Swiss-Prot record:
Family: Belongs to the TRAFAC class translation factor GTPase superfamily. Classic translation factor GTPase family. LepA subfamily.
Residues annotated as signal peptide: none
Organism: Pseudomonas paraeruginosa (strain DSM 24068 / PA7)
Annotated GO MF terms: GTP binding; GTPase activity; guanosine tetraphosphate binding; ribosome binding; translation elongation factor activity
GO CC aspect terms: plasma membrane
Subcellular location: Cell inner membrane
Designated name of the protein: Elongation factor 4
GO BP field: positive regulation of translation
The protein's role, per its UniProt record: Required for accurate and efficient protein synthesis under certain stress conditions. May act as a fidelity factor of the translation reaction, by catalyzing a one-codon backward translocation of tRNAs on improperly translocated ribosomes. Back-translocation proceeds from a post-translocation (POST) complex to a pre-translocation (PRE) complex, thus giving elongation factor G a second chance to translocate the tRNAs correctly. Binds to ribosomes in a GTP-dependent manner.
Length: 599
């Protein structure tokens, strides 16, 4: 296909559970990408984790050939995108490789906040957005209401939105037919020098770095020498090809196409995502606009349970960072937990997924400390520093002002649940900025402290609205706030990994709850264990795990009271000595207890 008019590059924008992976499965079936024997549900979600949780985490690409009713055969390059708020950067990368996007909306539930945010990203990048109403076979489908919502919330014309049901296959052909007419063909010159954008890369132990690319201009084939623009290094191409979704080698990749390039790059940072590839003999080709780097919003310490695993842990993180460019990490040491890494994540789900991937794919046992956000600290000498670890907070005497990150949150919620959602936002110290009543739903915009949002806000929002509310948030600014560091002392010793930065008003309550929670989780020892919560030098809460005690009087039958007293005194002295030298084992659950404290 030397002519680009046959190519259509598109991705699907949809909220979690609105059926985009199922729709992708139908496309693959109809275009004969896989035989019936190889077909399985959620065929693009290749990670076990994605299947179990029913969410898409990574962007995947598939090239399909579709014979349309006008007699032409089109090459469809479809890039799957995640729908969860934590993986927005994956979406913007996928969209950079497309000319159009399908906005898939559940005809029963209507528009969700996350789809709105991704849809705006697509429109900003100049993509043609085509609305599709899915799950039309369900009795609760209300196509007219949902069309109205798409028009009033997102502002795109939805009068001729295609209605389909990905599960039953109804209307999927109409979606494909509309797609080839609505979405424009890519622009590009096959004869021009090579320009290819790296959308994604991952590390294969046998092949080295595998890069998923969108070719803008030119062509690339096996044996070509390619230049990575950011590193200036030259590599020889071992193979190029496409996913159908099987790994299929082709003779070359041309302008407008999406496929993979393997060039035997062994250095993990050899082909960064968002970089431009060109041929060695045309090194002065312009760099394509990449993606903006996303800043992590949540930081947590990850430590291997056994210190022997530290090197393996570092290798695993390096390989994972290649595949997930938003993960950041730096070495950290803790008195309580030894050596590990301070990692930055986009949100709590991202953190859970990374931890699970490390444990599953790389067979590591890890302990995670409580996540925190980044605080801006203005010191008395005028210097501004950023702190992502409570134990690194400078002495309070040297701090002029502490500022916490505020995010702008957009919440879409049905009218019936509006009261509960507003109560939750007020409890989380939110300030209402705006409210729009739409047909059936209300859009509320709040400024909320990031600290309150990242921990459990998403879960609480879902439970107070019975799962109907949806949330999208983005960092807005830093704002001065009355913050303090809450330390946890066990037997008079501070445990650095348990420190938290909290708002002063919430501190006594948080401290009490944390201490009670720790009391349940720390196993009883042979001596009393005192658990205290402190702000600076002031203890604000205390609890004691009572000692186990052996009945030393069991062998005295009757007898003199002084004999009994002697045995009890001896036991007491032994316990006192033990308390001075004994150390308390803190289980992993205790570190996570910090999360479970309802603020």
């Amino acid at each position: 296909m030397s002519d680009l008019s046959h190519i259509r590059n598109f991705s699907i924008i949809a909220h979690i559970d609105h059926g985009k992976s199922t729709l992708a499965d139908r496309f693959i079936q109809m275009c004969g990408g896989l035989s019936d024997r190889e077909m399985e549900a959620q065929v693009l979600d290749s990670m076990d984790l994605e299947r179990e949780r029913g969410i898409t985490i990574k962007a995947h690409s598939v090239t399909l050939h579709y014979k349309a009713q006008d007699g032409k055969t089109y090459q469809l390059n479809f890039i799957d995108t995640p729908g969860h708020v934590d993986f927005t950067y994956e979406v913007s990368r996928s969209l950079a490789a497309c000319e159009g996007a399908l906005l898939v909306v559940d005809a029963g539930q209507g528009v969700e906040a996350q789809s709105v945010a991704n849809c705006y990203t697509a429109i900003e990048q100049g993509l043609e957005v085509m609305p599709v109403l899915n799950k039309m076979d369900l009795p609760q489908a209300e196509p007219e209401r949902v069309k109205e919502e798409i028009e009033s919330i997102i502002g795109i014309d939805a009068t001729d939105a295609v209605a389909c049901s990905a599960k039953s296959g109804m209307g999927v052909l109409e979606v494909l037919e509309r797609l080839v007419t609505v979405i424009p063909a890519p622009e590009g010159e096959i004869e021009a020098p090579l320009q290819a954008l790296i959308i994604d890369s991952w590390f294969d132990n046998y092949l080295g770095v595998v890069s998923l690319v969108r070719v803008k201009n030119g062509r690339v084939k096996k044996g070509d020498k390619i230049l990575v623009k950011s590193t200036g290094k030259v590599h020889q191409v071992d193979s190029v090809g496409v996913f159908t979704p099987k790994h299929t080698e082709t003779a070359d990749l041309k302008a407008g196409e999406v496929g993979f390039i393997i060039a035997g790059i062994k250095d993990i940072h050899g082909a960064p995502v968002g970089d431009t590839l060109t041929l060695n003999n045309t090194p002065d080709v312009e760099v394509l606009p990449g993606f903006k780097r996303v800043k992590p919003q949540v930081y947590a310490g990850l430590f291997p349970v056994s210190s022997d695993d530290f090197e393996d842990f570092r290798d695993a993180l390096q390989k994972l960072t290649l595949n997930d460019s938003s993960l950041q990490y730096e070495p950290e040491s803790s008195e309580a937990l030894g050596f590990g890494f301070r990692c930055g994540f986009l949100g709590m789900l991202h953190m859970e997924i990374i931890q699970e991937r490390l444990e599953r794919e790389y067979d590591l046992d890890l302990i995670t400390t409580a996540p925190t956000v980044v605080f801006e600290i203005v010191q008395k000498n005028g210097e501004i520093i950023y702190v992502d670890n409570p134990s690194k907070l400078p002495d309070l005497a040297s701090i002029q002002e502490m500022r916490e990150p505020i995010c702008r949150a957009t919440i879409l919620v049905p009218k019936d649940h509006l009261g509960n959602v507003i109560t939750l936002c007020i409890e989380k110290r939110g300030v209402q900025r705006d409210m729009h009543f739409l047909s059936g739903q209300v859009q509320v915009i709040y400024d909320l402290p990031m600290n309150e949002v990242v921990l459990d806000f998403f879960d609480r929002l879902k439970s107070t609205s019975r799962g109907y509310a949806s949330l999208d948030y983005s960092f807005d600014r830093f704002e001065p706030s009355n913050l303090v560091r809450l330390d946890v002392l066990i037997n008079g010793e501070k445990v650095d990994a348990l420190a938290l930065i909290v708002h002063r008003d919430n501190a006594p309550y948080k401290g009490r709850q944390l201490v009670e929670k720790m009391k349940e989780l720390i196993p009883r020892q042979m001596f009393d264990v005192a658990i205290q919560a402190a702000i600076g030098g002031q203890i604000i809460a205390r609890s004691t795990v009572k000692a186990l005690r052996k009945n030393v009087l069991a062998k005295c039958y009757g007898g003199d009271v002084s004999r009994k007293r002697k045995l009890l005194e001896k036991q007491k002295a032994g316990k006192k000595r033990m308390k001075q030298v004994g150390s308390v084992e803190i289980p992993q659950e205790a570190f996570l207890a910090v999360l479970k404290v309802d603020s």
